[in-house]
Amino acid sequence: MMTFCKANTAYLLVLVALAFSSCNQKKDVSNGYNPLEVSVGLQKTMCYGSCPSFNFSVLNNGHATLTVGRFAEKAFGRHLNEGKYTGTIELHEISKITEFAEKSGYLKLEDRYDNPMVMDIPAAISTINRKTVFNRHEGPDLKDLYSRIEHLISTVDWVEKPDTEK
């Protein structure tokens, strides 16, 4: 019986040691792997009038998506049917936008500028490198940033997604 207890104790100690050693394992992320995340995004919401509405985002690998709503031609200066699109943007073009935003103090802005009592003003929701700003009422003037993003959108060769993928 004593040998059985010693064997079980030794077995239990080995299991505990293995369990603790696996908790200390650290994953090496220095291999250059970058998780995909939104580098630049801009969404403009509808209003009761003819405000352009769309939702654009580009990942840090250059993969871009665009959902076109009503009156979007006003924003990009070109006609795109309402629907969903994909495209690719060169990384240096993305960097131009993110660097401009960072130099302009974008990362120091509040997250939300809004007044729920004001209804007929469209919102502009922008994202630059994990920082998102909801700008609808009495917020900072980000028209220059929005214009740069909208110009970028206008230069992409968008591919419309078929209805089955929407």
Write out the residue ranges for each language-model feature.
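Short, well-ordered, aromatic-rich surface patches in folded extracellular/luminal domains
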Residues: 7, 23-48, 54, 100-166
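Cysteine protease-like catalytic core of ubiquitin/ubiquitin-like
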Residues: 32, 60, 79
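A short, structured loop/turn motif at beta-sheet edges
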Residues: 58-62, 87-96, 128-131
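A short-motif feature that recognizes glycine-rich, charge-decorated loops
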Residues: 67-108
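Sec-dependent bacterial lipoprotein signal peptides
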Residues: 1-21
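Short, solvent-exposed coil/turn segments
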Residues: 13, 51, 80-82
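N-terminal secretory signal peptides
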Residues: 39-75
